[in-house]
From Swiss-Prot:
Binds 1 potassium ion per subunit. Residues 227-383 form the TrmE-type G domain. (6S)-5-formyl-5,6,7,8-tetrahydrofolate binds at residues 29, 91, 132, 460. Its EC number is 3.6.-.-. The gene is mnmE. It is an enzyme of class 3 (hydrolase). It comes from the Bacteria. It holds the Pfam family MnmE_helical. Exhibits a very high intrinsic GTPase hydrolysis rate. Involved in the addition of a carboxymethylaminomethyl (cmnm) group at the wobble position (U34) of certain tRNAs, forming tRNA-cmnm(5)s(2)U34. It is found in: Cytoplasm. Its main location: cytoplasm. K(+) binds at residues 237, 256, 258, 261. This is tRNA modification GTPase MnmE.
Length: 460
């Protein structure tokens, strides 16, 4: 693709996570025409492999302006075009931690006039513009970096390998074949028999089914990326925060005996039996005059509507009362995983009234008792089978383009039904192809491109 954005500058950024005050190794990536020369200005080395492509060699960072050494490093060099960006790349592997890393970056910039800090996603943007990756691969890299569970990472990596582009190209080639026949008939109509609207309709229907399956799988795949949301709903001080901590195996929420402690929504992503789950701890529901707490309670009722599933908690010590039943009545039954009675350790479970509680679980969250039964109910309700055949999923932008393509193909229906001039079909098919090309990045505006890559991290 011809570059529509200036890529003449040499850019630099931290390409690894840096811990505040400590860290093992940090990587500073430099890419561009002056990448090698700019690094030569601040690196002293005696290695015989220095500055050869695809070599790692030892050296020291030196600030020539202050005439002092900064750090001992390893240097990796990749010459154009055999690099991620397609440009010359140098990666400086220095000791981690904010102080050292910032000083290396400062030294690189102050000792060279032609180097600047990279914009978010600019390395990936250059890789795309230089034809090293297509747009779906670039976006999949970002999904991989931001994956919240292993399944999401696996699917994102399929996109990095080019699997999204493969599926889009199959659909695109099918449409190009249909368009080619229409245009050939327009140019050489006398050489063809009468146009068969039924055959065309049949072929378009097959293509539309492929698109619908891809859209549906992508929507299901969003659950993998974000996690199936399960909201913990109940009155105050019934153990919602304790359950969140139990399932996540971490102290994510404050646990006290003071009612109304949780006022903000707390989310934890985890995997249960290979199912990506997002557990949401909500504010306890009760009558209160406190303004801030009421905001949290309002959010709890919102989560009843917005979450995929719900676990309702109540205290066995108090029993399931009319207030609980009133809240439960607001929960769509298809969303309800279970009604969980907590604090089993404080009562005689034989005396619990289980009327209308066939779907209940009795637990002592404090003593880790009943977790296995709860997990079984979560797995049964959420299931993992719906994810078995998902190998890729498209993001919102890609789904939007695919949906627009589907609309183009649906717009051929009245043309076919009324047997209007068949050359009108070419308009819709061509627009459909353009929408598919937008997915892989062949039909772009500069603003759209900048918007996509601005959502990436700076070092990528």
């Amino acid at each position: 693709m011809e570059s529509i954005i200036d890529t003449e500058d040499t850019i630099a950024a931290i390409a690894s996570a840096v811990s505040l005050g400590k860290g093992g190794i940090a990587v500073i990536r430099v890419s561009g025409e002056e990448a090698i020369n700019s690094c030569k200005n601040i690196v002293e080395t005696k290695s015989k492999y220095a500055w050869e492509s695809h070599r790692v060699f030892h050296g020291f960072i030196k600030d020539n302006l202050e005439n002092k050494f900064i750090d001992e490093i390893l240097i990796t060099v990749m010459h154009s075009p055999n690099s991620f960006t397609g440009e010359d790349i140098v990666e400086l592997h220095c000791h981690g931690g904010v102080i050292v890393v910032n000083k290396v970056i400062e030294t690189l910039l102050s000792n060279n006039t032609g180097v600047r800090i990279a914009n978010p996603g600019e390395f990936s943007q250059r890789a795309f513009l230089n034809g090293k990756i297509d747009l779906t691969q670039a976006e999949s890299i970002n999904q991989l970096i931001n994956a919240k569970n292993l399944k999401s990472a696996e699917i994102a990596f399929n996109g990095v390998k080019g699997e999204i582009k493969k599926k889009i190209d199959i659909i695109k080639n099918d449409l190009i074949e249909q368009l080619s026949e229409i245009e050939a008939r327009v140019d050489f109509e006398e050489d063809f028999s009468e146009f068969n609207y039924n055959d065309f309709s049949r072929n378009i229907k097959i293509i539309k089914e492929k698109i619908k399956i891809l859209i549906e799988n992508s929507k299901r795949g969003a659950h993998i990326h974000n996690g199936i949301s399960i909201a913990l709903i109940g009155k105050t001080n019934v153990g919602k925060s304790s359950l969140l901590n139990l399932l996540s195996k971490k102290e994510k929420a404050i646990v006290t005996s003071i009612p109304g402690t949780t006022r903000d929504i707390i989310e934890v992503n985890l995997t249960i039996k290979d199912i990506p789950i997002k557990i949401i701890d909500t504010a306890g529901i009760r009558e209160t005059d406190e303004y801030i707490e009421n905001i949290g309670i309002d959010k709890s009722f919102e989560m009843i509507q917005n979450s995929d599933y719900i676990i309702y908690l109540y205290s066995l010590e108090e029993g399931l009362n009319k207030d609980d039943e009133k809240i439960i009545s607001k929960i769509p039954q298809e969303k309800l995983i279970t009604i969980l009675g907590n604090k089993k350790d404080l009562i005689d479970s034989k005396k619990v009234n289980k009327k209308n509680l066939s779907n209940s679980v009795l637990m002592s969250i404090k003593n880790d008792e009943g977790e296995k039964e709860l997990v079984e109910k979560i797995v049964k309700k959420c299931g993992s089978k719906e994810f078995e055949n998902i190998d890729i999923f498209l993001n919102e932008r890609q789904i939007s383009n695919l949906t627009d393509c589907l609309k183009n193909l649906n717009d051929t229906d009245p043309i076919i039904a009324n047997k209007l001039p068949f050359d009108l079909l070419s308009i819709e098919v061509r627009d459909g192809i353009k929408n598919l090309s937008r997915i892989t990045g062949q039909e772009l505006t500069e603003d759209l491109l900048n918007n996509i890559f601005s959502k990436f991290c700076i070092g990528k």
